[in-house]
Amino acid sequence: MPELKVEVIPEGTVIDHIPAGKWLKVIEILGLTKPNGGTLLIASNVPSKKLGRKDIVKVEGRYLSEEEVNKIALIAPDATVNIVRDYKIVEKFKVSIPDEIVGILTCPNPNCVSNHEYVRPRFKVESREPLKLRCHYCERTIEGEEIIGNL
């Protein structure tokens, strides 16, 4: 397999093993599409032994919050996050979907109390493969692209 050459970042976060074509959604949910979003390096549709094809996002000078990592897990459940300091990976971990997701998604049910009252949307994970979530308030289930569309 040919060597992948992507510039090394001095400080920041590398998100690897994103399914091919999902990099744009990742940078949108992280707010990196704005002019002051930070320096990005993106490798799209690159060969991967694990996924066949994958995307990689490098964010210079920025580290992710737990909520941001949880959002990434909903889009790319097999993603790996690398924390880089002084050009070296100092921490590496796989994202994981928490058992309960609070305040990240909106419920697609227009009649759900979470869309009308001051309560944080809350979802329980019913299954991880395929990913299926159930709203705590109205019991509506969502899965697949509907989850991504409600981030």
From Swiss-Prot:
Per UniProt, Zn(2+) binds at: C107, C112, C135, C138
GO function terms (MF aspect):
metal ion binding
Could you mention a single GO BP entry for this protein? pyrimidine nucleotide biosynthetic process
- Is the Hydrolase keyword given for this protein? no
Looking up SUPFAM superfamilies in the UniProt record yields: Aspartate carbamoyltransferase, Regulatory-chain, C-terminal domain (SSF57825), Aspartate carbamoyltransferase, Regulatory-chain, N-terminal domain (SSF54893)
Q: Which GO terms describe its cellular component?
A: aspartate carbamoyltransferase complex
Q: Which InterPro entries match?
A: Asp_carbamoyltransf_reg_N, Asp_carbamoylTrfase_reg, Asp_carbamoyltrfase_reg_C, Asp_carbatrfase_reg_C_sf, Asp_carbatrfase_reg_N_sf
> What keywords appear on the UniProt entry?
Metal-binding, Pyrimidine biosynthesis, Zinc
Per the entry, the cofactor note is:
Binds 1 zinc ion per subunit.
Task: Write down the PANTHER family for this protein, in alphabetical order.
Answer: ASPARTATE CARBAMOYLTRANSFERASE REGULATORY CHAIN
Subunit composition and interactions = Contains catalytic and regulatory chains.
**In UniProt terms, what function does this protein have?**
Involved in allosteric regulation of aspartate carbamoyltransferase.
NCBIfam families given in the database record: ATCase_reg
Protein name per UniProt: Aspartate carbamoyltransferase regulatory chain
Record the organism: Thermococcus gammatolerans (strain DSM 15229 / JCM 11827 / EJ3)
Q: What is the lineage of its organism?
A: Archaea, Methanobacteriati, Methanobacteriota, Thermococci, Thermococcales
